[in-house]
Amino acid sequence: VHLTAEEKSLVTGLWGKVNVDEVGGEALGRLLIVYPWTQRFFDSFGDLSTPDAVMGNAKVKAHGKKVLNSFSDGLKNLDNLKGTFAKLSELHCDKLHVDPENFKLLGNVLVCVLAHHFGKEFTPQVQAAYQKVVAGVANALAHKYH
């Protein structure tokens, strides 16, 4: 993904303040609530029957944290997202059969959650930089599908 030096600075500056545990669970939880068809990939997570059940689900929180830790790895390797996410792309494509469109959805939900958490600090410039990053990550995760 091509980011200017300023965009990289905006992304990494904000990311240093992100509580990965909290934001990861919230982002994955919101994905499962806003786009309920994504729940079919999480059959083993137990009760996802209501928004409260989803947001309180320990497995959703744990997997959300795992997802954001991987996203953090991507932020450290912005010039090689395909390489960084190659194994995860293979796993999600070959074993889990996740629709790659879901990666875009999760990226957009993550942007919403960051905006919610950071308010005025999440300026349009910060959002624009994050939109580039989440699109790049989604593309890298979908790479095995092409």
Curated annotation (Swiss-Prot):
Residue intervals of the Globin domain: 2-146
Modification S-nitrosocysteine occurs at: C93
Modification type N6-acetyllysine: residues: K59, K82, K144
Reported tissue expression: Red blood cells.
Keyword Iron: yes
GO molecular function, one term: haptoglobin binding
Positions carrying N-acetylvaline: V1
UniProt cross-references to Pfam families, sorted A to Z: Globin (PF00042)
One Gene Ontology term from the biological process aspect of the record: hydrogen peroxide catabolic process
Disulfide bonds listed in the record: none
Function noted in UniProt: Involved in oxygen transport from the lung to the various peripheral tissues.
Quaternary context: Heterotetramer of two alpha chains and two beta chains.
UniProt protein name: Hemoglobin subunit beta
Organism: Vulpes vulpes
